[in-house]
Design a protein with these regions (language model features):
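Class I S-adenosyl-L-methionine
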Residues: 177-179, 184-231
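S-adenosyl-L-methionine
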Residues: 1-42, 50-57, 79-121
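A short glycine-rich, Lys/Arg-flanked "PGG" loop and its adjoining helix->strand segment in the class I
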Residues: 146-160
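Conserved SAM/SAH-binding beta-strand->alpha-helix loop
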Residues: 70
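A short acidic, Gly/Pro-enriched loop at the edge of an enzyme's catalytic core
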Residues: 117-126, 131
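Conserved beta-strand signature within the Rossmann-like core of class I S-adenosyl-L-methionine
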Residues: 161-168
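Conserved glycine-rich SAM-binding loop
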Residues: 47
Length: 231
C-alpha cells in the first residue's frame, strides 16, 4: 500500500513532546523517561493510535509506547491526541491541554527491526500487534510482524514472563502466526478465530480503528496470546 506523503509530518513529529526523538538513547532508561517503575507495554504498528491511547487512559498504572514507522500515519495520532487534527468539515479546531493527554504514553517513529536497539533485555512486559501488514508474498514472510524473525527480536526485549497479543482479520496471516510459534520457541496461551463471538474475551477488549471497521462488515477477528517456553 502506497501511503500519501504529508509535507508537514516530519516537522510536527519532530516538535511533538509526545514523540521520543532519540529512542536509542533511552535504551535501559525508559523508567527515567516515565519517571516511575511501572510495567511497559508497547504496540508495534500503532497506526492512528486509538488502541494504545485508550489503553493508556484506562490503565494509568502501566506505561505505554506506540511504535509506528510511517510519519504520515504517526502524524494522525499525534495531531488527534494534541487536538490539532486537520478538520474535514471546516469545523474549528480545539487544542487539547496537557491534562487531556495521558502522562503514561509516548510514541516512537521507527522500524520494528530496531527494537533491540531501543529496549534493553527484559525492559518490556507486553507487546501488542494489531492488524499488521500481512505481506502476502512468500518472499516477504520474514517481514511479517508475527514471523519467527520478529519473534526473535521480541525475545530480546521482553521480560521473562512477558507476553505478546496479536489480533487480525486476515486468516492467512493468523494461520501463519500459529505455525511460527512452536518453531520459534514460544508457547500458545490462547487463541480464537472469532473474538467478537466470545463475550468473556470481549469484556476487556479495546478495539482499533481497523477492528471496528472489519467487525462492522462481519469479518471474524482472530486473536492469540503467546509467551516463551520456560528455559
Amino acid at each position: 500500500m502506497r501511503l500519501r506523503n504529508i509535507p508537514r509530518a516530519n516537522d510536527v513529529i519532530a516538535a511533538s513532546p509526545l514523540v521520543i526523538q532519540d529512542p536509542k538513547a533511552q535504551r535501559g532508561l525508559w523508567q527515567n523517561v516515565f519517571g516511575n517503575d511501572h510495567p511497559i507495554h508497547i504496540e508495534v504498528g500503532m497506526g492512528k493510535g486509538r488502541f494504545i491511547t485508550d489503553l493508556a487512559k484506562k490503565h494509568p498504572e502501566i506505561n505505554y509506547i506506540g511504535i509506528e514507522r510511517y510519519t504520515s500515519v504517526l502524524l494522525r495520532a499525534v495531531e488527534k491526541l494534541q487536538g490539532k487534527e486537520q478538520p474535514e468539515d471546516g469545523a474549528e479546531q480545539q487544542e487539547n491541554t496537557r491534562q487531556d493527554i495521558p502522562e503514561n504514553l509516548y510514541f516512537i517513529c521507527m522500524d520494528a527491526t530496531e527494537l533491540p536497539e531501543v529496549f534493553a533485555p527484559g525492559e518490556v512486559d507486553r507487546i501488542y500487534l494489531n492488524f499488521s501488514d500481512p505481506w502476502p508474498k512468500d518472499r516477504h514472510a520474514k517481514r511479517r510482524l508475527p514471523s519467527r524473525q520478529f519473534l526473535a527480536r521480541y525475545d530480546q526485549i521482553l521480560d521473562k514472563n512477558g507476553t505478546i497479543e496479536f489480533k487480525t482479520d486476515n486468516r492467512g496471516l493468523f494461520d501463519f502466526a500459529l505455525e511460527e510459534i512452536e518453531p520459534a520457541g514460544w508457547r500458545l496461551l490462547m487463541h480464537t478465530f472469532d473474538l467478537h463471538a466470545d463475550m468473556e474475551l470481549m469484556k476487556d477488549n479495546i478495539m482499533t480503528e481497523y477492528e471496528e471497521k472489519f467487525a462492522s462488515k462481519g469479518n471474524p477477528i482472530c486473536k492469540l496470546i503467546i509467551d516463551r517456553e520456560r528455559r
